[in-house]
């Protein structure tokens, strides 16, 4: 039996004045809780002021597959606009947590469904990529269709993403937008921030999780 206790515990700590940084799903979609990808929406932290926790607050981070996708989408939205997204994920075993997927189920296998993952990939980006006001997020209008698969890779997810842009763009312009993209962590030179949030590879067989999962210190 899975009991969603994280949300209650987080609230209690916030009420006691603590800053709670949460990886659980419980408060991700709350109107006054930032769903943070610092390179994209650091301005959403102003929502903390709307929380009623007596000096404490809750900040969440998204689903792991959501993070990788929105980092690639943000430069496209800023430069060309975006109408629709279709994504198929190939997610590593590490994303299942502990005890995760049994060895007998995972070896020589692909599991073509991950409970709850598709909904997260279809809804979380709308909040992350939205605009903030004093007390909530105006979600971006974007149609996202997701299919999630668990594959026999130890660590490092891969996503196949198709997009429909609002405005025409050449391959060169898209690559330029990705390579020029940076966010607040890069501007502040934060110690754990990657030098570049996005890496583009010309090689047709790249990226590969085993080769690239630790690039730029992971």
Residue ranges and their predicted role:
Residues 1-113, 136-137, 143, 186-190, ...:
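N-terminal Rossmann-like NAD(P) cofactor-binding subdomain of oxidoreductases
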Residues 109-216:
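Contiguous C-terminal substrate-recognition/catalytic subdomains in enzyme active sites
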């Amino acid at each position: 039996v899975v009991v969603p206790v994280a949300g209650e515990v987080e609230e209690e700590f916030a009420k006691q004045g603590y800053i709670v940084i949460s990886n659980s799903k419980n408060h991700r979609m709350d109107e006054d809780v930032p769903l943070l990808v610092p390179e994209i929406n650091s301005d959403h932290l102003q929502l903390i002021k709307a929380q009623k926790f007596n000096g404490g607050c809750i900040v969440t981070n998204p689903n792991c597959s959501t993070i990788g996708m929105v980092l690639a989408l943000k430069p496209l939205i800023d430069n060309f606009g975006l109408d629709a997204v279709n994504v198929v994920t190939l997610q590593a075993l590490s994303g299942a947590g502990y005890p995760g997927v049994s060895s007998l189920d995972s070896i020589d296998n692909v599991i073509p469904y991950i409970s709850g993952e598709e909904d997260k990939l279809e809804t979380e980006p709308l909040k992350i990529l939205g605009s903030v006001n004093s007390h909530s997020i105006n979600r971006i209008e974007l149609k996202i269709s997701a299919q999630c698969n668990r594959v026999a890779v130890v660590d490092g997810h891969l996503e196949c993403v198709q997009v429909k842009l609002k405005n025409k763009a050449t391959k060169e312009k898209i690559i330029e937008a990705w390579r020029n993209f940076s966010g607040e962590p890069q501007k502040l030179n934060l110690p754990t921030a990657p030098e570049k949030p996005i890496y583009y590879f010309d090689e047709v067989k790249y990226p590969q999780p085993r080769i690239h999962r630790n690039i730029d210190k992971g």
